[in-house]
């Protein structure tokens, strides 16, 4: 079942307070150090500041890419920057079950990404226990749009260790819609934090994960 925002949702979205942390219990799951390699041509990696001393490895593998994270971060290409009305999508496969349920997914509206104090983007993630999450980052603050929510659309790791999840964010003139395996799980209006979705679109992967990404695409049209 998908969730949509009406007038009440718009007001709630505007009133969201910053989160101190995206997920609890990180002190029991220390970030691993990973030996980084050369990035694929055209790609940029931006680790969360708290994980800047822990590297991550992002490499071309087969027809897609593989991310082995130490630190949590985002990955993007300048060529994928968009002005409006577009769709970003990718297929994700978690290669190993994590000790904790860490998240991976997509982001849009990335601007000032090289400046930790000014960076902004909207992101959409899933994790191995069948839940999804949507949030907006502005500088050091993370504003929760949808907290961790169970959805039958998200394939769980325990149900099939080699399962994949197709994710998409569709940015249209009046809404931003979020899809898991071709099922719309949520939608928000183009207002407040989601009024301007121009900028970079790319991938986000949290810490201590091994994730394969296939069929990454950014295309015009958000319907």
Regions found by a protein language model. Name each.
Residues 90, 159-189:
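Carbohydrate-binding surfaces in secreted/extracellular proteins
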Residues 23-52:
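Extracellular carbohydrate-recognition regions
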Residues 69-141:
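Secretory/extracellular carbohydrate-interaction modules
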Residues 8-18:
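Bacterial N-terminal signal peptides
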Residues 140-166:
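Short, aromatic/His-centered strand-loop micro-motif at the edge of beta-sheets
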Residues 54-74:
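Short carbohydrate-recognition loop motifs
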Residues 90, 214-218:
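Extracellular beta-strand elements of beta-rich domains used
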Residues 188-215:
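Flexible glycan-contacting loops in extracellular carbohydrate-active proteins
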């Amino acid at each position: 079942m998908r969730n949509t925002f009406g007038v009440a949702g718009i007001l709630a979205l505007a009133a969201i307070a910053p989160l101190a942390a995206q997920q609890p219990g990180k002190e029991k799951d220390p970030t691993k150090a990973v030996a980084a390699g050369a990035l694929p041509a055209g790609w940029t990696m931006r680790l969360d500041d708290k994980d800047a001393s822990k590297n991550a490895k992002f490499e071309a593998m087969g027809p897609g890419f593989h991310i082995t994270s130490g630190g949590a971060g985002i990955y993007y290409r300048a060529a994928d920057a968009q002005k409006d009305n577009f769709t970003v999508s990718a297929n994700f496969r978690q290669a190993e079950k994590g000790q904790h349920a860490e998240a991976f997914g997509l982001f849009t509206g990335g601007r000032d990404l090289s400046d930790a104090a000014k960076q902004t983007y909207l992101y959409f993630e899933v994790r191995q226990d069948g839940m999804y999450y949507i949030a907006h980052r502005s500088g050091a603050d993370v504003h929760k749009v949808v907290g961790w929510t169970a959805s039958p659309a998200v394939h769980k790791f325990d149900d099939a260790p080699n399962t994949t999840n197709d994710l998409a964010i569709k940015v249209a003139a009046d809404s931003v819609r979020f899809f898991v395996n071709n099922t719309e799980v949520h939608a928000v209006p183009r207002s407040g934090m989601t009024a301007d979705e121009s900028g970079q679109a790319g991938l986000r992967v949290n810490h201590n994960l091994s994730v394969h990404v296939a069929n990454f695409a950014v295309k015009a049209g958000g319907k």
